[in-house]
Amino acid sequence: MKGDFGDSVVNKVYEYRVLRRMSQKELADAVGVSKQTIFVMEKNNYSPSLVLALRIANYFEVDINEIFFYVRKDETND
């Protein structure tokens, strides 16, 4: 299908949250989303908006590129 690239954004939200010994609910409250949003994001089943990705990176005091990664479809089909 034209325009369906299949690219994705993967993340290390789980790793950063666990290092801080935080629950999903605590992180969700800190960045203004639901616990379910954090859950699906950690499973890489949801790509956050740029604003949410920036909020999360800011919360953990790291560059957005430390947590979120753009992956092209052809890079995942090795």
Identify the residue ranges that each predicted region occupies.
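Short, charged recognition helix plus adjacent turn
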Residues: M1-D4, F68-D78
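Short amphipathic helical patch at the helix-1/turn junction of helix-turn-helix
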Residues: D7, R17-L19, S47
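Short basic helix-loop element that most often maps to the first helix and adjoining turn
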Residues: N11-A30
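Residues in the helix-turn-helix
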Residues: E26, T37, E66
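Recognition helix of helix-turn-helix/homeodomain-like DNA-binding domains
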Residues: V33-Y46
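DNA major-groove recognition helix of helix-turn-helix/homeodomain DNA-binding modules
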Residues: V51-E66
